[in-house]
A protein has these predicted regions:
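Conserved beta-loop-beta element that borders a ligand/cofactor-binding pocket
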Residues: 222-262, 269-276, 282-315, 367-373
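N-terminal low-complexity segments that are often proline-rich with Ser/Thr-Pro
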Residues: 466-496
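A conserved pocket-lining segment of Rossmann-fold NAD(P)-dependent short-chain dehydrogenase/reductase
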Residues: 141, 242, 258-275, 303, ...
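A catalytic-pocket lid/entrance helix-loop region that shapes and gates access to the active site
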Residues: 76-78, 182-216, 313-334, 338, ...
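N-terminal Rossmann/SDR dinucleotide-binding element
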Residues: 2-135, 142-147, 153-154, 159-168, ...
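Conserved cofactor-binding/catalytic machinery of classical short-chain dehydrogenase/reductase
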Residues: 151-155, 283-284, 350
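Mid/C-terminal beta-alpha module of Rossmann-like enzyme folds, strongest
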Residues: 361-471, 477
Length: 497
């Protein structure tokens, strides 16, 4: 159990006389990776709305058929996160976004970010680079977690050097880098804490890449291909050759992914981390410190990021986070109980508080003394107990139930806080029942009952992964934000949550 309690004196630079954030960032250019994600979208919106004097450079991976700039337009600017800014700007919204946003095609899983000469020239003009791109799932395949979370920060720093960018790199990590260890985790770089690991990150990268290659090779052996084809035929019956081939290949790819997920979980546990996400983030911090080669670095470590408290509006969220699959499956009657210690702390932090802290760190600039760390979490100052969360959820869905297909309210049960094994068994039984039902109506088009079963199965698969990858309790930290300016925009005091 880790208590990520920040040192109260860690950031003595906070002064009332320091210029306000908006003034400090006026006229700056800020590059952001991971802008299409949950945190990245919120960060882009807040910079554009709250810091009118800044410009943004979004480093975005192009889709198979979608250029990077079009992805920004579709996936970021059309998100409901921007409803408030769109209303404020009215007819000027599109023109203002074109004026203030540059888009360069880049990918943190590639050396040099895959930037071309134009991209490097644009990156050179940036005063700050916020690296928020990450493989955030607790159960990411080992190789993808390594390429994105471990090597991503080092690639960003290297790309900055290659481009001649002398700006400040803000790397978003996680409070869980301390792993499943006991004791306070201070706001310090990992080598200066009791939680430093001796694992050789270069060896871990090489091993993960070998494992991907070896696992893929095994999946293509005659016995494995025969097994996948047999399963595909069992599911599809007398389907034609193209459908059978496509299903066989999907089963092969799924098998490879599952093997790499299990490998990531096992390797993380062997080194003292709860999952591949925390393990690769921790090694990513270490790799960045070793290879930054003069790039000024600040690390921001949030806990579990959840929906907004106030900005851009209360409750705003994008996609399934950690809590939503559990809450939804409970409300649907798919999950009768969930493992946990009643008095344990569920350390979640609203996304707008994380955004506020990152912007404040950007305004503060790098610490001349060297790499620094800011932890952004709620557990130390405003702890949410697991029992309290469960009670609140149950009371809400008792008063505002979901309804089944017959129009009847779904009654939610009492949670008894059982062990993880019992809940895993319950979830797998529910999954097996749904799979049997899916086979019985497999001839139906994907609508009606089959669509409902597919939806329920997707939720159950997510919840099962969460049960298996439950992070350690009581990962607690404080937000150390270096400015007081514009509190209405940059509030990050956990007591206000």
């Amino acid at each position: 159990m880790v208590d990520n309690a920040a040192d109260d004196g860690a950031h003595a630079r906070t002064r009332e006389s320091v210029p306000m954030i908006t003034e400090r960032l006026d006229g700056t250019r800020i590059a952001i990776t991971g802008a299409t994600g949950f945190l990245g979208t919120a960060l882009v919106e807040r910079f554009l709305r709250a810091v009118p004097g800044c410009e943004l450079v979004l480093v975005v991976r192009a889709g198979k058929r979608t250029p990077a700039r079009e992805r920004v337009r579709r996936e970021i600017l059309r998100n409901d996160c921007f409803d408030r800014l769109r209303a404020e700007l009215g007819d000027r919204f599109e023109a203002e976004m074109d004026r203030r946003i540059d888009v360069i095609e880049g990918d943190v899983s590639r050396d040099g970010l895959g930037l071309n000469d134009e991209g490097r020239a644009i990156l050179k003009t940036c005063h700050t680079v916020v690296h928020s791109a990450a493989a955030v799932a607790f159960d990411s395949p080992l190789d993808s977690a390594v390429e994105t979370n471990l090597l991503g920060p080092t690639r960003v720093a290297a790309a900055m050097r290659e481009a001649g960018c002398t700006g400040h790199l803000i790397a978003v990590s996680t409070c869980y880098v301390a792993g499943a260890r006991r004791g306070d985790a201070p706001e310090k770089v990992l080598p200066e804490t009791p939680f430093a690991t001796e694992a050789d990150w270069r060896a871990e990268v090489a091993a993960a890449r070998r494992l991907r290659s070896d696992t893929d090779a095994i999946s293509r052996t005659v016995p494995k291909l025969a097994m996948f084809r047999k399963r595909a035929r069992a599911e599809l019956g007398g389907a034609g050759t193209p459908l059978l081939a496509a299903k066989t290949e999907k089963l092969r790819e799924d098998w490879v992914r599952n093997e790499l997920v299990e490998a990531g979980r096992a390797r993380a546990a062997s080194l003292g981390w709860p999952d591949a996400y925390a393990y690769t983030k921790a090694l990513g911090e270490r790799a960045l410190l070793e290879t930054r080669d003069g790039v000024p670095v600040t690390t921001v470590r949030p806990s579990i990021i959840e929906s907004a408290m106030a900005e851009p509006r209360p409750g705003w969220i994008r996609g399934f986070r950690m809590a939503e699959p559990v809450i939804i499956s409970y409300a649907r009657g798919l999950l009768k109980e969930f493992p946990g210690i009643p008095e344990g702390v569920v350390d979640v932090i609203p996304v707008d508080m994380v955004v506020a802290a990152i912007i404040a760190v950007a305004a503060a600039g790098p610490d001349p003394s060297g790499p620094t760390v800011y932890q952004v979490a709620s557990g130390a100052r405003q702890p949410l107990r697991y029992r309290e969360m469960v009670t609140t959820i149950r009371e809400w869905f008792t008063e505002h139930p979901l309804y089944d297909k017959e129009g009847q309210p779904i009654l939610v049960p009492e949670w008894s806080f059982p062990g993880r094994g019992r809940v895993e068994q319950q979830l797998r039984r529910a999954t097996n029942l749904l799979k049997r039902g899916e086979k019985l109506i497999a001839a139906l088009p994907v609508r009606g009952s089959q669509a409902e079963i597919v939806s329920d199965l997707e939720v159950l698969h997510i919840v099962i992964r969460h049960v298996i990858c439950i992070p350690p309790k009581n990962h607690i930290a404080k937000c150390g934000a270096p400015f007081h300016g514009r509190q209405e925009f940059f509030r990050c005091d956990i007591f206000s949550a």
